[in-house]
Amino acid sequence: MDDERGKLAVYPGTFDPLTMGHVSLIRRGRQIFDRVIVAVAMDTPKTPLFSLDERVRMAEEVFADHEGITVEPFSGLLVDYAERRGANVILRGLRAVSDFEYEFQLALMNRKLKRHVQTVFLMTDYQWLYISSTIIKAAASLGGDIKGLVPDNVYRRLREKYGYPYPLNPGLALSTEADEDLPPSL
């Protein structure tokens, strides 16, 4: 095996948007591998909130000062992309047992397609276990404050997408008149 190949890992995803869970895993992956490519998926069955260019740009901004971490768009089969880039490792994160079955199936299929490409799993840091891009978008779209759960540049972009400032939570009364009929709080 070529000595350089074991030093490069590909971390794929849609990153719509990039979360602090992703950032943590990428940084930890960089501690293991000489280089990590953050591979932003062009082809996705999901309808992204952010365009491919926006997702790539946001990730580039986050990792601009991180030596050994690069961001690239990719399309097609991940194992083909990894092979073209000279990587024999796909880096994946696991949040919970529920992630394992799907990730295990993907790893087996990738291994079947390209035997020399290995999948390495890292457990997500405990403080990010409940975070996913889908949950972040849902909370932000309803006015939830997701500051600290995504990088600052992503936070600003989400505010732009959903309106600045975030809209009030529609479940809250806009007037205190409705509260007058309620018993006082304990």
From Swiss-Prot:
Cofactor section: Mg(2+)
EC id: 2.7.7.3
Entry-linked SUPFAM superfamilies: Nucleotidylyl transferase
Gene: coaD
Subcellular location: Cytoplasm
Coiled-coil portions: none
Binding annotation for ATP: T14, F15, H22, G93, L94, R95, E103, W128, L129, Y130, I131, S132, S133, T134
Protein name, entry field: Phosphopantetheine adenylyltransferase
Similarity remark: Belongs to the bacterial CoaD family.
Provenance organism: Nitratidesulfovibrio vulgaris (strain ATCC 29579 / DSM 644 / CCUG 34227 / NCIMB 8303 / VKM B-1760 / Hildenborough) (Desulfovibrio vulgaris)
NCBIfam families: coaD_prev_kdtB, cyt_tran_rel
GO cellular component: cytoplasm
Molecular function GO labels: ATP binding; pantetheine-phosphate adenylyltransferase activity
Known partners and oligomeric status: Homohexamer.
Keyword Nucleotidyltransferase tagged: yes
Gene3D superfamilies: HUPs
Entry binding sites for substrate: T14, K46, L78, R92
Pathway the protein acts in: Cofactor biosynthesis; coenzyme A biosynthesis; CoA from (R)-pantothenate: step 4/5
